[in-house]
């Protein structure tokens, strides 16, 4: 009987250690408040990109990219915020003066964010563009996915590298 009494504290300690390890592992899987805020900020960032493109707001469009960002699509790579802004200003120029200039609406789905660390993340989402003349009809104009590297600069998430894959 004394042997059982001596082993009981060791057994309790072992059980407590296993329980604590399980709790810590479970807690590690739960997102922190900071991570949840970062996910929301990234979601807003990618939506802001589509709003800027659909409304042809060149400054808003450029603002979602880091100063030295790279953006690759259609066989071209644009380097730096000014070159990326020019994508939209060129589009504005092409549409200027058109009586029934085309409109576009981007829809994003299946957004996935993976944090590399607290200042870098990977983002992937699928997109579809509905487009057509202002008077209609609208059709699927394109579809593909975005693959992004995001960086946190001055507390703000920005696109460092974006590749459009169709």
Predicted regions and their residues:
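Bacterial N-terminal signal peptides that target proteins for export
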Residues: 1-13
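Short, low-complexity N-terminal intrinsically disordered segments enriched in polar/charged residues
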Residues: 24-55, 59-63
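Aromatic-acidic/polar surface patches that form glycan- and anion
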Residues: 38, 42, 54, 77, ...
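Bacterial N-terminal signal peptides
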Residues: 10-22
């Amino acid at each position: 009987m004394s042997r059982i009494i001596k082993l009981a504290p060791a057994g309790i300690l072992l059980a407590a250690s296993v329980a604590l390890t399980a709790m810590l592992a479970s807690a590690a899987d739960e997102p922190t408040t900071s991570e949840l805020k970062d996910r929301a900020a990234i979601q807003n960032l990618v939506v802001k990109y589509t709003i800027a493109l659909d409304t042809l707001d060149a400054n808003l469009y450029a603002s979602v990219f880091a100063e030295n960002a790279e953006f690759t699509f259609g066989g071209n790579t644009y380097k730096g915020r000014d070159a990326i802004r020019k994508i939209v200003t060129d589009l504005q120029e092409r549409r200027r003066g058109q009586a029934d200039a085309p409109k576009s609406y981007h829809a994003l789905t299946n957004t996935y964010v993976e944090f590399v660390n607290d200042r870098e993340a990977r983002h992937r989402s699928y997109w579809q563009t509905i487009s057509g003349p202002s008077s209609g009809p609208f059709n699927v104009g394109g579809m593909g996915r975005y693959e992004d590297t995001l960086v946190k600069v001055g507390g703000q998430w920005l696109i460092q590298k974006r590749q459009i894959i169709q």
